Amino acid sequence: MARKKVALDFEQSLADLQTLVERLENGELSLEDSLTAFEQGIGLTRDCQSALAQAEQKVQVLLERDGELAEEPFDAEQPE
């Protein structure tokens, strides 16, 4: 269940980031609101980058074989 929560948190952070970008690109925010949105966006970006880095580490651990790391490219189309 924790894995789903992390995935949902990542997806929500990504959606929130997209919303902030759209608001900033729209150009209707005041300078103060733009700076606040920018700060929030930086935080969301860091959260997303951290979640992606953790996921990458988990994939590398799962691919570990015979005490050596066998890095393989991720292929979403590859059957399990």
Curated annotation (Swiss-Prot):
One term under GO cellular component: exodeoxyribonuclease VII complex
SUPFAM superfamilies named in the record: XseB-like
Organism: Pseudomonas fluorescens (strain SBW25)
Family listed: Belongs to the XseB family.
UniProt superkingdom: Bacteria
Keyword tags: Cytoplasm, Exonuclease, Hydrolase, Nuclease
Subunit structure: Heterooligomer composed of large and small subunits.
Gene3D superfamilies: Exonuclease VII, small subunit
Subcellular localization, as worded in the UniProt entry: Cytoplasm
Molecular function terms from GO: exodeoxyribonuclease VII activity
Record's protein name: Exodeoxyribonuclease 7 small subunit
Reactions accelerated catalytically: Exonucleolytic cleavage in either 5'- to 3'- or 3'- to 5'-direction to yield nucleoside 5'-phosphates
Swiss-Prot/TrEMBL GO biological process terms: DNA catabolic process
Documented EC number(s): 3.1.11.6
One Pfam family recorded for the sequence: Exonuc_VII_S
PANTHER family assigned: EXODEOXYRIBONUCLEASE 7 SMALL SUBUNIT (PTHR34137:SF1)
Main localization of the protein described in the UniProt heading: cytoplasm
Role description: Bidirectionally degrades single-stranded DNA into large acid-insoluble oligonucleotides, which are then degraded further into small acid-soluble oligonucleotides.
